């Protein structure tokens, strides 16, 4: 069967695009499974600890003996969905297979800990070991998996026919991974990205969408949202009732969103200067349309890195007053210890990755999707391997996963700039980054900031997101939402499980912040709306027509660039 509904939010967290930190997507995903220097250090470390290593292997042998005798008490955790079928524990043979698998996995994990590697080598080795363990799970084996065997009996083997067809289709074109969502259930502009609005500015780089107010009164200062550049913009405008943009305009906040054009090889030279310049153009257009000299601005993931650099440029040129408020959504500006991806990166690979994207003229979003899936294969490869191929069923219907599959390309120039920015941690040191002829110093961005992170986010870990409170020069309000990455943002008030943590202070240490944080039940969307309301001026009558300041509607939302392939 398709993954249970309760698991969709978790899968969405893990399926969100990486954008910036996945700096080596161009080199291909399976390269990570090849032994490297970290693997050699691991082997040497174990060889230098023969007593400890021997004790671990002896314990494994003893446990395997207990498994064979039927006296082992090993059992998979209840939360491990791979072994939820009662047959895994009720069938004597299957129980022994699972117990042997668990025993070997625990021993491997203990050996990695025994090696006492530094944090980077430890993460690299654990990545390899955990991924191999996921691949070798008995749940991935046809007929050994009891659900697969039952499906074969019930359908007279038709499940394997359907699964084989799906496998051939998925492997025929990028990304060569199991399909994660039933894309036939969604259509952009029909049941997703449907909040009414119009394109009021179109350049070769972007379309600017103004959303139609849905209240009689609106706040005079509008909000501009800057999305990532490797997926389409509508993560903030998903299905009705789950759209942040819809929520904003239904509550009196004027909203604009950038929709990036999908670049091709001809646009290879577009770099950070190009995209910051485009955001400046959009910001100017927002102010013209609304007849104001200020706007609030926020971004999402890597889009917020571009927005942050734009804010730094405004500060350097004496125009920061144009920003009434600033937001950072699941964004890492300080890449110190930036999680697994930071550990996996190395200079040689980064140079090769930039060379590959330069030859193509772009980084293909499908390569990025494939690489990201192999970062969490247990959930993003093997989960769907079982559902799609062994059971012969369709993947789930879920709007975030549909958005995630709708990838775009990133220009070679921007790819190289993101790689250098992340690896050299340029935003941490004032003046290390120069954009449009100005040195960027984020401490000069003293606009009030609203930051959101996901507590389960392994792409942009919340502790790394929190460090932005120390980089920016203004007063920050930090929100720690449930879930991870994009699912932390798609958190409407109708979600009964929604909650978030907040504190009145922002100490330097994120763990100290957590100790003082209070848990609020419900969505953080109303909190953000109230925060914006305090900074977005007085209410005024909503405009009757879209456009203004010499800009007129060019097309209905969601525009035309969102359909580029």
Cite the ranges covered by each PLM segment.
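Amphipathic, low-complexity, repeat-rich surface-exposed segments
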Residues: 1-207, 218-219, 256, 321, ...
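Alpha/beta-hydrolase-fold enzymes
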Residues: 117-154, 161, 288-292, 306, ...
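Cap/lid segment of the alpha/beta-hydrolase catalytic domain
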Residues: 215-289, 339-340, 492-509
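Histidine-bearing beta->alpha loop at or near hydrolase active sites
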Residues: 262, 456, 481-500, 504-507, ...
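Alpha/beta-hydrolase fold nucleophile elbow
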Residues: 283-303
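Mobile cap/lid helix-loop segments that gate and shape the active-site cleft of serine hydrolases
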Residues: 404-440, 447-448
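Short beta-strand/loop motif that positions the catalytic acidic residue
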Residues: 451-453, 457
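Short alpha-helix in the alpha/beta-hydrolase fold that links the catalytic acid
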Residues: 461-471, 482
